Amino acid sequence: MANIKSAKKRIKVTETKTLNNRMVKSALKTVIKKFEAAVAGNNVEEAKTAFVAVTKSLDVAASKGVVHKNMAARKKSRLAAKLNAMA
């Protein structure tokens, strides 16, 4: 357990940021699963709208520092390839 006041504050801040990051990552995974389901079901229109949502979510997560920007770019690229393979 921390004894110094600033260390105690850092523990609180870390817990808060951990919860926020977990929420963003969970939402991101949910949106990606929705896109994957649309691709698996050969639903092109639904896949296109889901892809826009995935792209936006990845950009937000990358800008907030929740995920690395290269990881976001890689995911977007791979998901775009899946979308283009459908059409």
From Swiss-Prot:
InterPro entries: Ribosomal_bS20, Ribosomal_bS20_sf. Signal peptide: none annotated. GO terms for molecular function: small ribosomal subunit rRNA binding; structural constituent of ribosome. It comes from the Bacteria. Keywords: Ribonucleoprotein, Ribosomal protein, RNA-binding, rRNA-binding. GO terms for cellular component: cytosol; small ribosomal subunit. It holds the Pfam family Ribosomal_S20p. GO terms for biological process: translation. Belongs to the bacterial ribosomal protein bS20 family. HAMAP family: Ribosomal_bS20. Binds directly to 16S ribosomal RNA. This is Small ribosomal subunit protein bS20. It comes from Clostridium botulinum (strain Alaska E43 / Type E3).
